[in-house]
Amino acid sequence: MKSLLACVVILGGTAIAIGSAQTPPAAPAATDVYHVHFTKAVPGQAAALGKALSVPDKASPMPEHFVVLRHQEGDDWDYVVIEHMGPKAEVTAAAPGGPDPARDLRAWHSDTFVSGPSWAEFSREMGLGGSAGGSPVYIVGVQRAIAGHRDQLTKSLTTIDPAAKIVTGNVFLTHLEGGEWTFATITRYNSWTDLGADRAAAPGTAASVGGWDDIRQHSAFHRDTIADRIYPAK
């Protein structure tokens, strides 16, 4: 992806990733900054935009540190790109070097800086590289907390049901600058079958911490989208 970032300095340090084990270990420290880019293609250019977003920016210090997820069901965006920036990010007034191949393919986009876990932890939870395989499915959610309920919503969104039968990968990101939401969550399922089984079991846990009823006690608004991954391919 052609980087949108080139001076404002943004530091990480306020988010966590939740381990995929059914009794999660202590959450790792949130040390890094990520750039979350939601975008929609102009009519007829969705495939071309996806291809453009999947090209690593060789000018970036970490050109391979990003994922591109593609909308399947839910919100109005076509793609979300989550780019790892390291422990801090800088924005300058200087225009990015070279042309942006995605610029004329976008109908709109939104950009938000968030804090999150290390790239190693993010990669593990999202099933990137190594022995990861199959056809993972993701649920990307954004939430804004009710005033005074930030801590409660954090707990709701980061609690994993220890009795859950489906193992998932989970990343929790906290807004630093940009969009109107407070938190973003990404849940990885190993297959559509796992996603279906988890959703079928959801009504039975609605009232528990992290369940449907619980989250709605603390969230002013939310948007959830089912997506697949187009970059990296493995």
What are these regions (language model features)?
Residues 20-234:
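Short S/T/G/P-rich N-terminal loop/turn motif that feeds into the first structured element of a domain
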Residues 6-15:
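Bacterial N-terminal signal peptides
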Residues 1-4:
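Positively charged n-region of N-terminal signal peptides that target proteins for export
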